[in-house]
Amino acid sequence: MSARNTKSGNERDPASASRGIALLMALLALTMLTLIALSMAFVSSTEVLINDNNEKRLLQLYAAESACEEARLRIRSLLDLNLVSFTDLNRTVYLVPGSSINPTSGDETTNPYFDPNFDSTLTTSILLSELGSLKFSWTRIWPKTEIRAGYSLDDAVLTTDPVFYGFNKTQSAAKPTQYVNSGTYISSHIGSPVFLVTALAKDPAGFRQAVITDIARIPCPPLQAALFSEGSVQILGSAVFVDGNDQSALSPSSLNGLESQGDIMGDASQIHGSPLAFRFFSSYSYEMASLLKMFRPPVLRDVERLNLNIAKTGAGNYEGTGVMLGALPANGNVSQSVYVDGSLSISNSSGQGILVVNGDLTISGEFTYQGLIITNGKVSLNGTGPGIRILGALLASSVNGSQTSVLDGTINLVYDSLVIRKQFDSLLYTRIAFRDF
C-alpha cells in the first residue's frame, strides 16, 4: 500500500492565511485613511468656522470702535448743548445709526437693541449718528461712576460719585490716574471728569461685540510756581520779573514766583509770589515721563505736522524765527497745542496754547506767549527789545536734574490760572482706557 500525504482538518492552507492577512491589513489601512479624511474634514470645517467667527468679530469690533471714536469727538458739543453734564450725572446720550433703533424701549425680549443698563430715572437724549451706513447698534455716553463701570478704583465699596482723571496735588512726582471725586479727594486732587462710552455692534445673525472706553480731557498738572525748575536757576541782571500772584479775578489761586530743586543764583529782587517769592532746594518734583506720555500726540499736535516756520536740524533738534504758535487774543485768539520731540530754539515769535518740549528750550529776542510751557530739559531765556513776555506758567524738568536754566535780558513772566485753563479747555477729549468684550 502506498503512503498518502494527508493534512489535518485543523491545519490551514498558507496561501489562504496570507490572503486573510492581506485583507485585514487592507481593511485597517482603509479605516485609517477614512479616519484621516474625516479628521482633515473636521479640521477644515473648524478652521472655516474659526475664520468666519474672527471675521465677524473684527467687523463688529471695527464698527464699535468707530462708534466710540465718534462719541469722543462729539462730547464737547454735547456738553455745550447740556445733553451731558459734569454735575448732572443722569444726563445720558445715545447715538444710533437710524431712527428705528431705540435702546430705551421695551426689554431684552421684545427689543434686540435694548440697553439692559437703561434706567427710567435718566434724562436721556437719542441722537442720530454721523457715521452714515456703518453698521453698529448704539453708543451710550454718560459720566463715569464706579457703579456704572462695574469695578472699584480703590478696592472699596462701589460708589455713585463721579470719577475724575488727574493728579494728587499734595504728592510729589504724582502720575495722572483715575479717582473718585468725593471726600478729601476734592481738595487734594486736580483733574477733569471722565465719561464712560459704551458702543454695541450686532449683526443680523446675533453676533455681538461691545467696546467700552474711558474718555476725558487732559488735566493741567499741579503747578507750584510761575516758573518751576528741577535744575538750578541763574538770574542775570535786574530786568527779570517773575510773579506767581494769580492775575485771574475768577477764583484766583496764587503760586510761588520761582521754585527750584537746585539753587537760585543772581538778582531775585524782582521775583514775587505767594506764599513765597522764591524757594530753592525744593523737595517737589514732577514725573516727567508720565507727563510726556500724557501730552504726546495726538493729544497735542506734532510740530512736524504743523505748518510752522520751524526746521529740524541734522542733530534732531528744532529751530525757528518768527514762529506763530497759535494766535494771541488780539490777533485772532487761536489756541495751538504743540509737542516738540527734541530741543527747540526760537526767536522773535509769539503764540497761545500749550507748548511741550522733550528737550532743552531756548528763547531769544522778542517772544510773547499765553499759556503753559513744559520742557524736559533746561531753559535759556534771553529777552531783547520788548523782551520775553509770558502770561501763564513755565515748568522745566531736566532729565538729570543737574542742568542750570538761565534767565537773561528783559523777561516778564506772570502767572494767570484763567489763561492756562482756557488752553486746556480747548483740547479735544482723549481716550484714557479701553476694553472690549
Q: What do the PLM-derived regions correspond to, one by one?
A:
Residues S192-T198, N333-S337, G371:
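Short, hydrophobic/aromatic-rich segments at coil-to-beta transitions
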Residues S2-Q234, Y415-F437:
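Beta-strand/loop motifs with alternating small/hydrophobic and polar/acidic residues, enriched
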Residues Y318, G322, A327, G332-N348, ...:
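Extracellular beta-sheet-rich ligand-binding/adhesion modules
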Residues S290-A330:
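Terminal domain-start segments
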Residues T104, E108-T110, D115, L128, ...:
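Long, acidic/serine-threonine-rich intrinsically disordered regions with weak helical/coil propensity
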Residues Y185-I190, I346-N348, S364-G365:
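Surface-exposed acidic, glycine-flexible loop patches that form ligand/cofactor-binding
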Residues P222-R301, T362-F437:
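Predominantly polar beta-repeat domains that present long G/T/S/D/N-rich surfaces used to bind, process
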